[in-house]
């Protein structure tokens, strides 16, 4: 009888623990990643780019506005 009681306690405690983990997993949010993607999308759709034309390492003229308006883009500097 004692072994049955211990087995039931272990079973219910593991179920309760796994349910707690599942509940906590649902509350984790990642708004920063979503916000970051939206900002990059808005920047890339911006037609009034503050970037000036740049020259690459081969001497070719690069219009950064044609590439993107995101300041993190390679070769695009103010």
Curated annotation (Swiss-Prot):
Q: List the disulfide bonds.
A: 64-69, 65-73, 68-76
What does the record give under GO molecular function? Answer: toxin activity
The cross-references to InterPro entries, in alphabetical order and at most eight, read: Heat-stable_enterotox_CS (IPR019806), Heat-stable_enterotox_STa (IPR001489)
* Signal sequence coordinates: 1-18
Task: Report the locations given in the UniProt record.
Answer: Secreted
Alphabetized Pfam families for the sequence: Enterotoxin_ST (PF02048)
A GO CC annotation recorded here is: extracellular space
Which superkingdom?
Bacteria
Question: Where is it mainly found?
Answer: secreted
Which positions does the propeptide occupy?
19-61
The UniProt keyword set, sorted, is: Disulfide bond, Enterotoxin, Secreted, Signal, Toxin, Virulence
To which protein family does this belong? Belongs to the heat-stable enterotoxin family.
| Record's protein name | Heat-stable enterotoxin ST
Q: Which organism does this record belong to?
A: Vibrio cholerae
Name of the gene this protein is made from: stn
């Amino acid at each position: 009888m004692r072994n049955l009681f211990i087995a039931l306690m272990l079973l219910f405690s593991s179920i309760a623990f796994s349910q707690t983990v599942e509940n906590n997993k649902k509350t984790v949010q990642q708004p920063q990643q979503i916000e970051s993607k939206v900002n990059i999308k808005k920047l890339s759709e911006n037609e009034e780019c503050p970037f000036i034309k740049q020259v690459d390492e081969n001497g070719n003229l690069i219009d950064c506005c044609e590439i993107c308006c995101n300041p993190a883009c390679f070769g695009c500097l103010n």
